[in-house]
Amino acid sequence: MDLGHWTLSEGVEITDETFGFVYLIECKTTGKKYIGKKQCKSRIKRKPLKGKKRNRIDSKESDWKTYTSSSNELNELIKKYGKENFEFKILKVCDSKWALAYYEIKEQIDNEVLFKEEYLNGIINCRIGNAPKLEMEKYHKNSK
């Protein structure tokens, strides 16, 4: 599978089922880092078929292969030093929106991005509810 400019961490694999991933971008010149998330798929609402009432929901691939970041500061550094001076690394793949939000926050807190100068993350922002039952089962299975 074509990954664009992204590299995979050891043991990480992107498949057609992947909903999104948590990533680390590091500037090789300055050592500055950024942890974020990106969805690989986006939902599209389509009109109902003739005679039906419910909208159809489809998905399409997002721009993840060329995506750099939502951080303006990081994008300015990429313009200044060039994309080739940055490492774009996928840390974890997720199969749901809930898991993607959870693991982005977990990675940011574990790395103390708000306390360390080398990180460009200026805010940890998330709206996340209780874990769906399926996610809880996966979490407990993987944490043993």
Stretch-by-stretch model annotation:
Residues M1-K144:
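Structure-specific nucleic-acid interaction/processing domains
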